[in-house]
Amino acid sequence: FPYTTLFRSTGIVTTTDNGGSTGRIRQEQGGIAWGDLRNCLNQIIIEPSTASALFEYRFTGEGELSGHNLGNLMLKALEDMHIRPIEAINLIRELLKVKSHIIPMSEEPVHLAASLGSGSSIVGEVSIDNLTELPQSLFLVPMVKAAQEAIQALEQAEVILLGPGSFMTSIMPPLLLPELATALRNSKAKVIFIDNLGVEIGAASQLSLADRIQKINEIVGAPVIDGAIIPYREQSAVDLSAISPIKILAKRLNADDISYRHDRTLLAQAIDELVGELDYE
């Protein structure tokens, strides 16, 4: 059986967003960042429904609600009712009939920060996304505890996927939590990096595949990546000697309607193929 259909999938999601509707809610009400969690739930809905359309509804007009996403407000309301973020997500999962599990990297409010070459620091994903130079390092403010369920998911995983997503603001933040870095470092699972289909906007665009893999390994404290899935058109640009002995699988992965978005079926097939090759070695 294919790995992607045989096993239960669990997503560990970054909670450092401070832009858009999420940023406004955090600035005015505090709490964790719900935007990426909401978006992940929406992306894995198999059967669209009135409930899923309601969850993704975004207010328009000129009032205070303009630009706010109803799903963000629903999750924030559950948080204000003193419901654990993970339990709040599970309630929405049941409403949307989502089978996959979604876990925040932490259940405590946290922001992403960066140290710059000038010696100064900036705080916030929005500021980091707007950088034109690569930061010297990334760190969390304040340092928080990882969600226990996230640690357990890594410890029990048979395959761990990193990406796709914004490298500095989506993939890296969970790895900055010592408990998650340790769990990944000690894991016996096959670890696969999934590259983006398009070039990132901002400083992250300066990083090659080898650079990104090296930064992950540095943060985790060990060479943890076993394989990488990349767009077939980029395979000629990859310096294989720089990432050896990592197994590279280059495939057509883009959706027909949006060139920079992965097609679910094609990506699942690529994951199955690469896991099979890694298991055979």
What label would you give each PLM region?
Residues Y3-L6:
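Short, small-residue-biased leader/transition segments that mark boundaries at the very start
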Residues R8, V13-G30, L131-T132, A147, ...:
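Conserved phosphate- and dinucleotide-binding cores of soluble alpha/beta proteins
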Residues T16-L131, D272-G276:
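Electropositive, gly/pro-rich neighborhoods at or near active sites that engage anionic ligands
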Residues E108, A183, L197-V199, I258, ...:
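Non-transmembrane, aqueous-exposed alpha-helical and coiled segments at domain scale
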Residues A113, G117-P178:
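Internal active-site segments that recognize and position negatively charged phosphoryl groups
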Residues L161-G163, I192-I194, I229:
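Structural motif
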Residues Q206-E281:
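C-terminal functional extensions of proteins
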